[in-house]
């Protein structure tokens, strides 16, 4: 869970709460076709469906808010084991993915950094933040795919690679990484080695 940002010796850092996570399911090659661990995080107090209650009962854990599956997880773990921040070491690099802040429906100037049409001279009006041409006329008779236009901005999954682990605080399950992490405060994130 992303907590907030801070500075350590003039370096921008982000505080992450990364545990304790419970192993709620272990998938194997012979049973599921691939091997992975399913981790649960953030205890859920109410409004859990019966199917999820049964799922968590198998691992003898409390119901969780967030479930994430990790492939290629190294280590000798059993169902119901807890994984804490001690999994990480100071100085190593991690990849963090999360959902960015949603900005709603935005124009091309905010969404893609267009300059707009520019000077309001030569009789122009109401064109300051317009995208301009989106293609030729009757020759293609269509707009090419991928044309940058106005639309939903943010609220998309983004992965930030190679963030350095500055500090590991075992007693609070806090991980401090150098740099920024996508999402708002208290949003769910995934940290991979």
Report each predicted region and the residues it spans:
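Basic, glycine/proline-rich low-complexity segments that contact nucleic acids
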Residues: 12-166, 175
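Short, small-residue-biased leader/transition segments that mark boundaries at the very start
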Residues: 1-8
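A generic structural motif
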Residues: 5, 97-99, 192
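Long terminal accessory segments
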Residues: 171-193
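Short beta-strand segments in beta-sandwich/barrel cores
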Residues: 2, 21, 181
């Amino acid at each position: 869970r992303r907590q907030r940002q801070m500075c350590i010796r003039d370096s921008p850092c982000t505080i992450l709460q990364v545990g304790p996570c419970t192993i709620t399911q272990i998938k194997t090659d012979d049973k599921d076709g691939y091997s992975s661990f399913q981790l649960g995080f953030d205890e859920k107090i109410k409004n859990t469906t019966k199917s999820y209650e049964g799922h968590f009962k198998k691992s003898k854990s409390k119901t969780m808010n967030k479930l994430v599956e990790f492939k290629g997880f190294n280590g000798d773990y059993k169902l119901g084991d807890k994984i804490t921040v001690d999994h990480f070491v100071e100085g190593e690099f991690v990849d963090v993915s999360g959902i960015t802040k949603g900005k709603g429906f935005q124009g091309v100037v905010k969404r893609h950094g267009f300059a707009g049409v520019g000077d309001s001279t030569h009789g122009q009006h109401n064109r300051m933040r317009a995208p301009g041409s989106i293609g030729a006329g009757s020759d293609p008779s269509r707009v090419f795919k991928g044309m940058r236009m106005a639309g939903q901005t943010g609220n998309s999954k983004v992965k930030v690679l190679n963030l350095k682990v500055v500090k590991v605080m075992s007693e609070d399950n806090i991980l401090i990484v150098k740099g920024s992490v996508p999402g708002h405060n208290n949003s769910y994130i995934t940290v991979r080695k």
